[in-house]
Amino acid sequence: MNAALVSIEGLTKVYEGSGLFGRRRWTVQAVSDVSFEVRRGETLALVGESGCGKSSIARLVLRLTEPTAGRICFAGEPLAGMSGPRLKAQRRHMQIVFQDPMASLNPRKTIGHILGQPLAVHRGGRPAHYLDEIRQALALVGLTPPEQFIQRLPHEFSGGQRQRIAIARALMLRPELIVADEPVSALDVSIRAQILALMKRLQGELGLTYLFITHDLGVVRSIAHRVAVMYLGKIVEIGDVASIFAAPRHPYTAALLSASPIPDPEVSWRHRRIILKGDVPSPANPPSGCRFHPRCPAVLPICGTVAPVARELAPGHLAACHLNDPAIVGERAPGMAGTGVVEPPRAWRDPPPSFEKGRSDDHP
């Protein structure tokens, strides 16, 4: 098992504000007591509905936002105590690829200037001084010959080409960690596959580590080694992609999997869709107990009052759900006596058929 590059313990982020004339104050708990690690050389996917806190975690990991509580370590060093030149030096090892390449690239600057700027900031001089590195980065992401791109502006390229440029910019400082915040959601399906293939190739060639944020489970299956599922500021399940897709142990994870479309008509009619009732509660006023209990199809009386703790159900597979606690449910799965693992409810025990057909074994 690879050592952890990023370690997060008890991470919490609360945003505060006030209404007109400061008469009414409000707080939003975007991230609540989150703990996980990202291992060297792996891709950890962070999935969940919009507003669940995925992008907030990305900004916290990169120190673009200060945490309210908790601890973030990069390569064993706490980020909280870093500032000034020390933080600047550490940021060379952490870069980000944003969702919309058109919004993240300066429309007034040439591609050569955009790619050379990170080197100019960290090494000094002007972006034009680093033409050799710029050419190498463009070639690395498949934009060849580089001379055809250096003097052009972002609007002259397609969406896929712009995202390749954004990836090249993230690679200029040769980082160890890349945070990819929905990097393919703004692209069409064919271009999306090309960008994912590029990112996998770069990871193999350069030894990159990805924190990959997405809402698309098909993308998770394609690129990730492990996946963490978030709901309303908390991680409800985390583990290997194969393990979670084959046997989800949290009702929310199962609902997400069941919502994925099935292109094969031979199996789509047998697909059990789990319909979640109600809306996602407001993070300004989260439910007591388990935050998912108002929408859970397998809710228990205890769920509304006691927050579940994450239990390890298999090596590296953790889920925070009372249904996995034998002391509460009182029945064990057949053949699992003494393991502490209980049989999931029948409504969400089996994986959707689409995830078993045509599996990919590209990663361990």
Task: Locate each region found by the language model.
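Short catalytic/signature loops enriched in Gly
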Residues: N2-A4, G17-G22, T27, E147, ...
